[in-house]
């Protein structure tokens, strides 16, 4: 069994003293959203880096249910933080550039006022008398903390899981105070499935004889069994099916010997028992109940319309990240957030990161090369502007390719076809070269859609808004006539349902610009006729016949006929010989290797 068998996102976390924690007592009482008042609120927080003279480089990190203020090490002598892979010098959230704040949330058990705090009215811990709190109450406390620190506006708010709920709340409750929002592996409301796991966990705690109505802070028994079971249930939801197979599949009947009284016949049982026992040493059962209930009550709307109405209040740029194997906060739930932001014309980027790690992916190093780079790139452009290096090589990216050559000559013509100061949606935007050109020209509302992760990262590095989506699944997130122009550049030949995709782009755009390789180009005909072989050359046709992404081999004449059959108006056609660098006016179907159409319906 591997040495890391017992390791997880919890590894290294403990109840040790937080040596760098700071404490502030908030001014005035805290009126709670669901009624009641906390008259004395203390917040424990940690900071990293330096606040600059303009006080505009502050990044607030919101932790998840079982987190605390110790997001990262302060020095080599310090204990590990729960997000060292993301926060620190040179890390995606670079503490050499940003002033990072991470407070323990309201209701927590690591110093901020919670159920284990002393109620000034009784002199005893609040325990079950601690009032019901909400994500909004947590964010209100964080807002007052930023007031105390003299920060009017946060460069960004970042958080995963329940931390993502806090990010969503910040963006809608205090829109003028947030420059960028990065909700990770989260949702606008819990699914019934996720809610069910929390209900079982809370029941396990309150039915433990050691719970004693919540007043277990004396020398008597504590609800350790119930809290451990709640945590075991949680850990099941944090792992994906594949992660469990990799961790336990080959050693199912070889459990690790751990000093717990839970079932240990199977390796997964010894793992869960160990995790439950670890958690009991550092967390409070009443806090678990209070915080999980706040998470379960969080709800930005049970319909796309309600969610869009709620998110409409935000003024920030957005980066939404999900993970393909997360079944607790599924990618579909992140996509609901993204779709609501798209519906209200917000600046949003989205990536569903390929991962086998499940919900815990955002806390593990396995995929940080991608989600971490998205965070780094987004933060560097969160206040607007694009990266204008001009050289793709500077970023370690391939230059954009044309049908046959290393330069996208069709982009020059496409840019000329787009009227100034118009909105543009670029489908299959690649690394964002066309969008960057348009942004430089002064277009303020330009959005890309792309499927490839690395291309999305490249776009975010440029400061562009790009949403990960598969064109073959439609453009339902976009409204009728939402954009002045929709561009489908050198993508149509890889589309499965051409009629549906073309119909969709004509619905979303007032004008659509479609470019594609002309498979009737005379050089391709020659290869087929004289050599009897499938045409193969550089650019888009560099693939072998058996591994080509191109599935539609059509010509300029074919597309013109298609437009006629579909009742599509062709406003302009440009035919190019990209090898010669010239426009073709005679027998374009034979002499052009690339065509550009401007169409509408």
Residue positions per predicted region:
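A short SAM/SAH-binding and catalytic strip from SAM-dependent methyltransferases
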Residues: 485-496
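S-adenosyl-L-methionine-dependent methyltransferase catalytic module, highlighting the catalytic core
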Residues: 500-504, 511-601
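Conserved alpha-helix/loop element of class I SAM-dependent methyltransferases that forms part
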Residues: 405-421
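Short beta-strand/loop motif that positions the catalytic acidic residue
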Residues: 320-322
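Class I SAM-dependent methyltransferase SAM/SAH-binding core
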Residues: 433, 437-474
């Amino acid at each position: 069994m591997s040495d890391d068998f017992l390791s997880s996102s919890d590894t290294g976390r403990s109840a040790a003293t937080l040596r760098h924690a700071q404490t502030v007592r908030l001014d005035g009482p805290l009126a709670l959203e669901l009624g009641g008042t906390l008259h004395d609120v203390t917040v424990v927080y940690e900071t990293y880096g330096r606040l600059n003279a303009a006080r505009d480089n502050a990044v607030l990190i919101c932790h998840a249910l079982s987190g605390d203020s110790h997001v990262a090490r302060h020095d080599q002598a310090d204990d590990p933080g729960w997000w060292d892979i993301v926060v620190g010098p040179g890390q995606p959230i670079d503490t050499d550039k940003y002033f990072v704040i991470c407070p323990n949330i309201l209701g927590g058990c690591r110093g901020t006022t919670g159920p284990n705090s002393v109620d000034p009215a009784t002199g005893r811990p609040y325990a079950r008398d601690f009032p019901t709190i909400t994500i909004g109450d947590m964010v209100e406390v964080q807002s007052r903390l930023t007031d105390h620190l003299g920060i009017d506006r946060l460069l960004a708010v970042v958080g995963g899981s329940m931390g993502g709920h806090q990010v969503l709340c910040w963006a809608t409750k205090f829109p003028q105070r947030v420059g960028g929002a990065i909700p990770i592996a989260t949702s606008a409301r819990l699914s019934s499935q996720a809610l069910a796991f929390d209900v079982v966990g809370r029941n396990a705690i309150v039915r433990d004889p050691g719970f004693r109505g919540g007043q277990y802070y004396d020398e008597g028994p504590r609800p350790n069994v119930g809290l451990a079971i709640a945590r075991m249930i949680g850990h099941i939801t944090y792992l994906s099916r594949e992660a469990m197979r990799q961790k336990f599949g080959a050693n199912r009947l070889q459990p690790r010997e751990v000093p717990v009284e839970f079932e240990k016949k199977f390796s997964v049982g010894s793992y869960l028992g160990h995790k439950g026992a670890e958690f009991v040493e550092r967390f409070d059962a009443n806090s678990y109940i209070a915080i999980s209930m706040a998470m379960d009550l969080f709800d930005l709307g049970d319909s796309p319309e309600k969610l869009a109405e709620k998110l409409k209040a935000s003024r920030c740029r957005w980066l939404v990240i999900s993970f393909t194997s997360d079944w607790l906060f599924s990618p579909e739930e992140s996509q609901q957030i993204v779709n609501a932001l798209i519906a209200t014309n917000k600046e949003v980027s989205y990536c569903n990161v390929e991962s086998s790690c499940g919900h815990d992916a955002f806390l593990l190093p396995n995929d940080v090369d991608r989600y971490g780079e998205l965070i780094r790139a987004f933060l560097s452009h969160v206040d607007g502007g694009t990266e204008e290096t001009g050289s793709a090589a500077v970023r370690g990216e391939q230059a954009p390719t044309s049908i046959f050559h290393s330069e996208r000559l069709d982009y020059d013509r496409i840019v000329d076809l787009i009227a100034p100061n118009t909105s543009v949606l670029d489908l299959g935007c690649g690394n964002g070269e066309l969008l960057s050109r348009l942004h430089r020209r002064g277009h303020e509302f330009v959005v890309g859609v792309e499927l490839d992760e690395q291309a999305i990262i490249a776009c975010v590095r440029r400061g562009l808004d790009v949403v990960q989506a598969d064109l073959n699944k439609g453009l339902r997130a976009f409204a009728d006539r939402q954009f002045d122009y929709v561009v489908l550049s050198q993508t149509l030949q890889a589309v499965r349902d051409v009629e549906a995709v073309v119909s969709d782009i004509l619905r979303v755009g007032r004008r659509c610009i479609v470019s594609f390789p002309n498979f009737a180009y005379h050089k391709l005909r020659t290869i087929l006729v004289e050599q009897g072989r499938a045409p193969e050359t550089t650019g888009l046709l560099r693939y072998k016949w058996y591994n080509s992404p191109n599935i539609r081999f059509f010509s300029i004449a074919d597309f013109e006929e298609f437009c006629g059959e579909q009742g599509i108006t062709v406003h302009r056609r440009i035919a190019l010989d990209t090898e010669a660098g010239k426009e073709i006016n005679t027998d374009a179907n034979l002499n052009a290797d690339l065509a550009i159409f401007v169409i509408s319906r």
